[in-house]
């Protein structure tokens, strides 16, 4: 019973990390599209927005790294 509880908690931790990775991937995809559009149109305002919005991607990356390190530390033998 305890093993199942531990496995369920581990699965939840992995699912939370995966959800953040998927969210970050969506933000990266949007940034690439907007960046390409800004380049093509030589739109400096849009390019500046892409650079500014990169902070959200960086923040998610930091959270993902922290979560992954925590899961590894907790689950390591």
What is each of the regions a protein language model found here?
Residues 1-77:
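Cytosolic, long alpha-helical scaffolding segments
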């Amino acid at each position: 019973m305890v093993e199942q509880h531990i496995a369920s908690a581990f699965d939840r931790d992995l699912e939370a990390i995966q959800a953040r990775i998927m969210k970050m991937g969506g933000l990266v995809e949007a940034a690439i599209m907007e960046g390409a559009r800004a380049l093509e149109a030589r739109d400096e305002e849009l390019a500046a927005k892409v650079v500014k919005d990169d902070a959200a991607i960086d923040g998610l990356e930091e959270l993902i790294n922290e979560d992954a390190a925590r899961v590894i530390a907790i689950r390591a033998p």
